[in-house]
């Protein structure tokens, strides 16, 4: 839209609210208000020295390039990026409902119909990304936000990657890593379908299928592939999860020749009108409580790191981000 800010002067620092939530160790997200149009945005502010120290340069560039390319109702929108000699800035749409993670923890677990609603929207988002040769690689409840109506928005595209061939880096959250990622066999679209299986299990059971006190223990359980289902889960729910959590990725649902259609045609989704899903026509099971457009009560607020203590970086380091 034409009213979007061209420079940070349009988002004066005094209009920044306290950070909404941390984005790892090198970034914070602020709620900002565009004065003239009174629109709220999320401004992600990342410390360049920290990004470099943690070797996250590629992830930051990936996030920008992927978000600039996509446009889908279930993916968070990026409007503008910029940088100065200390920080990188990404101005994104503000999604006020908070993380799916919070709702799941508050309820303990979701009913099958609630889990199914979120799964349908996530399937559409994954299918859209995969059609563009993008692997998301970080599907988990913390990265799924709810908009004001209760529909999903995937956020945090730092691990997302445009596929040229199978990729080889180990990234993601231990409980959600696919076997081929742990075994360094290279991984493509199949990792997102594995993560969907983990997510559906966690939504309807209240805990992930593979967990342990340390990552190595989790990895062993993932590779063994044994799933203990709670007794109350019905056959079709268990069947879908089993077919998504197949260790051999060539036999994993979603990763065979019919791609996402195999997932969409599974009996668990038999009542779903797939054309209606991306049009946001399905009725959300949870509608976030909001008092106003700029309400941040669905997020935990974090104390402000003192941005002023971040030193400017050298010209050489700044060169890495010249196109940001």
Task: List each language-model region with its residue ranges.
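Conserved N-lobe ATP-binding subsite of Hanks-type protein kinase domains
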Residues: 28
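Conserved N-lobe beta3->alphaC-helix segment of eukaryotic protein kinase catalytic domains
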Residues: 40, 45-71
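A short, aromatic-enriched beta-strand patch in the conserved N-lobe beta-sheet
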Residues: 80-81
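Conserved short submotifs of the Hanks-type protein kinase catalytic core
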Residues: 86-99
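Activation segment signature within eukaryotic-like protein kinase domains
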Residues: 118-119
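C-terminal regulatory tails of eukaryotic serine/threonine kinases
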Residues: 249-324
């Amino acid at each position: 839209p034409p009213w979007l800010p061209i420079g940070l002067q349009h988002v004066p620092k005094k209009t920044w609210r306290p950070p909404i939530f941390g984005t790892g160790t090198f970034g914070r997200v602020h709620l900002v208000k565009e004065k003239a149009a009174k629109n709220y945005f999320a401004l992600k502010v990342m410390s360049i020295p920290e990004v470099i120290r943690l070797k996250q340069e590629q992830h930051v560039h990936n996030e920008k390039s992927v978000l600039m390319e996509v446009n889908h109702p279930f993916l968070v929108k990026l409007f503008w990026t910029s940088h100065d000699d200390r920080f990188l800035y990404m101005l994104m749409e503000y999604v006020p409902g908070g993380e799916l993670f919070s709702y799941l923890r508050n309820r303990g677990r979701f009913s099958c119909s609630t889990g199914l609603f979120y799964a349908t929207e996530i399937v559409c988002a994954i299918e859209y990304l995969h059609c563009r040769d993008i692997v998301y690689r970080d599907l988990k409840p913390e990265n799924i936000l709810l908009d004001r109506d209760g529909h999903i928005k995937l956020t945090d595209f730092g691990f997302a990657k445009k596929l040229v061939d199978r990729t080889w880096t180990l990234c993601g959250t231990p409980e959600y890593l696919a076997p081929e990622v742990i075994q360094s066999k290279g991984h493509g679209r199949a990792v997102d379908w594995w993560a969907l299986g983990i997510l559906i299990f966690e939504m309807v059971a209240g805990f992930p299928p593979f967990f342990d006190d340390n990552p190595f223990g989790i990895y062993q359980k993932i590779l063994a592939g044994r799933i203990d289902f709670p007794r109350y889960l019905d056959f079709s729910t268990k069947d879908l999860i089993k077919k998504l959590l197949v260790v051999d990725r060539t036999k994993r649902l979603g990763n065979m020749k019919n791609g996402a259609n195999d997932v969409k045609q599974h009996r668990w989704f038999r009542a779903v009108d797939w054309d209606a899903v991306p049009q946001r026509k399905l009725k959300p099971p949870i509608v976030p409580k909001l008092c106003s457009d700029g309400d941040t009560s669905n997020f935990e607020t974090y104390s402000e790191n003192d941005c002023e203590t971040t030193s400017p970086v050298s010209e050489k380091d700044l060169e890495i981000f010249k196109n940001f």
